[in-house]
Amino acid sequence: MTQPLAFITGASSGIGQALALRFHQAGYRLALVARRTAEVKSWAEANGISASSYEIYSADVAITDSIVAAGKDCLARQGLPDVVIANAGISVGMDTADRDDLDVMARTFATNNIGMAATFHPFVPGMTERKSGTLVGIGSVAGIRGLPGHGAYCASKAAVISYCESLRGEMRPFGVRVVTLSPGYIDTPLTRQNRYSMPFLMQPQDFADQAFQAIDKADSYRVIPWQMGVVAKLLRALPN
């Protein structure tokens, strides 16, 4: 029996690496996408992942043709994935009064939103024909309540949640599942730049364990950790 295959973007650090390790531990072959491919190879070797159980694809998720080409390359080299995780994303603060920050917003949406759709794109025809598969979008609790100074990131993650809701309805008749995961604060190189308190901070592998459960159960939507879901809902209820 062929081992299942997981296609994961943003695999060079943080959540992406933690998810890759968790899926490897569950017996999946890996298709790992990153710009820094040498780092992915070193990480795989350090974690004892055999070269025969993974492939690395160089791509920039912000460039549509680049990530689409990586997906098509995966289809040719490893076949149709069972799980596709659109994890790659960026978070940059912005000031609407600053002209240059309009470009920051465009780059954020190109990566976090168009990049997600482009990640899924090559695999949708095969999954709908096969009538199975799981598409996973990584959102954020920041998509539930906007944070001052982070308009681009918060808006992009709110769009992720809505996009995955739409896609879920489109894919359901074909037996393809769409899972939205909204992390709270995870200890990654990205969040270590934050200069404010991060309640319920999780280690990446703890997040990956809970994320794997949610994906395996085909949850439509899950906030991880659940406490941040409560916090986000309370904040959402407050006057803006």
Ranges and model annotations:
Residues N47-D65:
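Rossmann-fold cofactor-recognition segment
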Residues T180, Y196-A232:
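C-terminal helical subdomain
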Residues S12-S13:
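Conserved glycine-rich cofactor-binding loop
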Residues A26-W43:
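Conserved glycine-rich Rossmann-like NAD(P)H-binding loop of the short-chain dehydrogenase/reductase
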Residues S91-A106, G149:
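Conserved mid-core segment of classical short-chain dehydrogenase/reductases
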Residues F120, S156:
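Active-site helix of classical SDR
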Residues S140:
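Residue(s) in the substrate-gating loop at a strand-loop-helix junction
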